[in-house]
Amino acid sequence: MTHQSHAYHMVKPSPWPLTGALSALLLTSGLAMWFHFHSTTLLTLSMLTNALTMFQWWRDVVREGTYQGHHTMPVQKGLRYGMVLFITSEIFFFAGFFWAFYHSSLAPTPQLGGHWPPTGITPLNPLEVPLLNTSVLLASGVSITWAHHSLMENNRNQMIQALLITILLGIYFTLLQISEYFEAPFTISDGIYGSTFFVATGFHGLHVIIGSTFLTICLIRQLLFHFTSKHHFGFEAAAWYWHFVDVVWLFLYVSIYWWGS
């Protein structure tokens, strides 16, 4: 093993960035095949290669940080900066959807009937399933904070309970969102209202699924004694991401469901 006189982790050559990029290419190609030719073969293959890449890449990161001790304080600081920049990029990603929504709703064109929601669109009642979804996500924000505080206090059992509650609330939110989509009286092809509604809420739903997966991995790692009160950036990053998902939903609820209806 070569000697190094610095605290930074010099990452070994890894195949996972390459397989990840190829999997992403397969995923986008598979989606195009599914949309235009109704074939899910390439999409299924891409999901499999994506899952294998993520599992093996994250496995290597866990080995480097938990078992080999490569995640020193400067390395953790860099990871924190990376996560902050990632969440910032996600904020701008959703800002584009809000821009599209407000651009269309604040000055409706004559083609939309000159008012919002457009003529012929029956919006969802914001006081029914959307309000329940809001309550579920806010409750999950409380439980993830409870899990974080329990971890800081070395209370292992409470941390596991709170994290499990958060994951279950995330799954419940996803199921409610799916049921809402099936019951919606409009579709993604119903003009600007349908497209902005389903794209904005759909991408948020995708982020909830990603966040739930992130938290499930953290739960497994906690069960395997990977986290301590001093060394748990994986969980901290997941908690940041979950709070971001919470805040985005509040903006979606106020803008699209409540004001937009």
From Swiss-Prot:
Gene Ontology molecular-function annotations: cytochrome-c oxidase activity
Entry keyword annotation includes Acetylation: no
Pfam family, one: COX3
Location(s) in or outside the cell: Mitochondrion inner membrane
Alphabetically ordered keywords of this record: Membrane, Mitochondrion, Mitochondrion inner membrane, Translocase, Transmembrane, Transmembrane helix
GO CC terms, sorted: mitochondrial inner membrane; respiratory chain complex IV
Superkingdom, natural source: Eukaryota
Mitochondrial intermembrane side: 35-40, 106-128, 184-190, 257-261
Catalyses which reaction(s): 4 Fe(II)-[cytochrome c] + O2 + 8 H(+)(in) = 4 Fe(III)-[cytochrome c] + 2 H2O + 4 H(+)(out)
Topology within the bilayer: Multi-pass membrane protein
EC assignment: 7.1.1.9
Family under the similarity heading: Belongs to the cytochrome c oxidase subunit 3 family.
The protein's role, per its UniProt record: Component of the cytochrome c oxidase, the last enzyme in the mitochondrial electron transport chain which drives oxidative phosphorylation. The respiratory chain contains 3 multisubunit complexes succinate dehydrogenase (complex II, CII), ubiquinol-cytochrome c oxidoreductase (cytochrome b-c1 complex, complex III, CIII) and cytochrome c oxidase (complex IV, CIV), that cooperate to transfer electrons derived from NADH and succinate to molecular oxygen, creating an electrochemical gradient over the inner membrane that drives transmembrane transport and the ATP synthase.
Protein name, entry field: Cytochrome c oxidase subunit 3
Organism in which the protein naturally occurs: Hylobates lar
